[in-house]
Amino acid sequence: MSKESKDNKDDSPAPAGLDKRDWIAGLERGVSIIEAFDDANPRLTASQAGQRTNMTRTAARRYLLTLQHMGYVASDGKLFWLTPRVLRLGRSYLESARLPRVVQPFLQRVAAGTNEIAYLSVMDGDEVVYIARNGPNRSMSTGYVLGARVPAQVTASGMLMLALRSDAELNEWLATRQLTVFTSHTIASMERMKLELARIRAQGWALSEQQLDLNSRGIAVPLRDRHGTLVGALNITMPMGHESSEDAVARVLPVLRETAQAMRNLI
């Protein structure tokens, strides 16, 4: 059988724990085509899409043309790019998931108590995704938009959720990742990262300053459900201004902690 024929059959192995009969490889490949586009690769040829998804050019082209017919992809005949219709997929999550809706009144409480933008964020792979936010009107045009994805290693919420992983999960992450440097303040060595994550785990909250953007500060606390399971992080981002780290923590941390505790029995 040719590689092209294989690419168009659902014959790839199912993930561990999923019966082969319940696995639709074509759906997995279609999603992987959408995920092949990113900041560094906003437009792709069929060959490039195939290389990024481990498909042949012919198979990638068929998925791209199918997505184009569905309205998720546009093309000039050579290059392909995502259309705004893709945002419907993320919007479906934000509108159907219970957590972003439940958290809104509490984010409003944090924003009112701190005069800063408050967020709920979750982990997806090595990134933090912001799934809810609330803040003063003067600030809502700044900060992270809903659905924004940021490397976990440089955010307070991301470092917090990394620190609260099991020892095995955290050690695996530390052993298999490379740190990206964004500013002169970014933690660039795994030894220093390991020490910082240990400190965060011990104190139960995280502070990150100027690791992704200069003059930006983040403070985060864990958000747990009634069973104690970590479901995300409640966090504030703010410009550093003239407020010291100690003063910012003293002002914001109690509000974050009280709000996270109040939410615990509702999620």
What are the roles of these predicted feature ranges?
Residues 2-11, 139-212:
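Short, solvent-exposed recognition segments
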Residues 223-226:
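Sensor-regulatory modules in signal-transduction proteins
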Residues 82-177:
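Amphipathic alpha-helical effector-binding/dimerization core
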Residues 2-101, 261-266:
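N-terminal helix-turn-helix
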Residues 217-221:
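Short hydrophobic beta-strand micro-motif common in sensory/regulatory domains
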Residues 214-215, 231-267:
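Juxtadomain coupling helices with adjacent low-complexity linkers
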